[in-house]
Amino acid sequence: MHKPTPRTESPNALAFITRFFAAESAGGLVLMAAALAALIVANSPLGDSYFAALHAVFAGLSVSHWINDGLMAIFFMLVGLEIKREVLAGQLASWSQRALPGFAALGGMLVPALIYVAFNWGRPDTIGGWAIPAATDIAFALGVLSLLGKRVPLSLKIFLSALAILDDLGAVLIIALFYTSDLSIPMLLAALGSIAMLVALNRLGVKKLLPYLIVGALLWFFMLQSGIHATLAGVALALCIPLGKPDEEARSPLLHLEEKLHPWVAFAVVPIFGFANAGVSLSGITADTLVDPVPLGVALGLLVGKQVGIFAMAALAIRAGLARLPDGSNWGQLYGVAALCGIGFTMSLFIGALAFPGAPELVDEVKVGVLIGSVLSAVLGVVVLRRFAQRG
């Protein structure tokens, strides 16, 4: 996830952004290691113990549910903090800044979804996974981008970060609108009451974080019981935490919380999620499995849909005069970044688990598709960026 960026230019701005991307890429590398470890363990003699541990029940929920509904609420809270900061005072603060990543994010969500739907049309048991290839994993993408060092201009990394913020926003809306189960009206009303309390705290000018966190914990519980996915409590909480005025940046509750959360999310929450969700037994995977509609739709949605959707919409915006290429970059480098956006690991796996509850065989197929599509996208992106870095 993304650490806070300065809201005003300063002599140290470049150094700050450089440190930010170094930390981001480091988190991506840790996530890669966790995913690889999960695959190794799941296909070793420890595989049965690995899956048994994930299904062990603690306080009424399995370990897997605690990770996906509990820990990931912290991940989504950081997503919400980033969205609010960037829209109010960051890379998305003006319409001109939003244009290129906005068009790119739209194309990068629509085309992969259409590709998945094309492969799963007429299959009511699998069509609900249409949103799986629509997300980009920013930590993974920046981790891969870091392997290229100075071959990639900083402006492209900022573009990728802004695109990912809008991509995350789209994923949050998709989860809220399309992956909500049967609702409990009393619990939903209690959740709405909690949100009203958070808004009241904000309007009253409360700057202490503790009251927000206490009400946020209640909101998480009510959402868990209501049928709305509990992770959205993290987003709602984040959007109510005050950013403060530019001259109060040192005392900004939002920036303070974001700074504290970032290392925990990057180096604990997301790697734990990756380790718990990337493990899939390959013993039953055959050539026929790879061409099943779900893994094929997911893999091609990420590999083909992401790069085509992002590059085509970005090019359209640039040619129409609505946006311009990131400073110091060329068309080939923009295409390379679009290919890297096919790395859809964390959010794709998360949406896959929501799309097919109670269907572990389909979730395993999603994992195969996500892994294949993400790895091939990473390889293609690196090859393209290395090729065009020599010319640009």
Swiss-Prot record:
Domain of life: Bacteria
Keyword field contains Cell membrane: yes
InterPro entries per UniProt: Na/H_antiporter_dom_sf, NhaA
Pfam families: Na_H_antiport_1
GO MF term list: sodium:proton antiporter activity
GO terms classed as biological process: regulation of pH
GO cellular component, one term: plasma membrane
Entry's localization field: Cell inner membrane
Transmembrane segments: 20-40, 61-81, 99-119, 127-147, 158-178, 181-201, 209-229, 265-285, 298-318, 336-356, 365-385
Presence of keyword Cell membrane: yes
Keyword annotations from UniProtKB, A to Z: Antiport, Cell inner membrane, Cell membrane, Ion transport, Membrane, Sodium, Sodium transport, Transmembrane, Transmembrane helix, Transport
Chief place of localization: membrane
Catalytic activity: Na(+)(in) + 2 H(+)(out) = Na(+)(out) + 2 H(+)(in)
Membrane topology: Multi-pass membrane protein
Function: Na(+)/H(+) antiporter that extrudes sodium in exchange for external protons.
Family indicated by similarity: Belongs to the NhaA Na(+)/H(+) (TC 2.A.33) antiporter family.
The protein's name in its UniProt record: Na(+)/H(+) antiporter NhaA 2
Organism: Pseudomonas syringae pv. syringae (strain B728a)
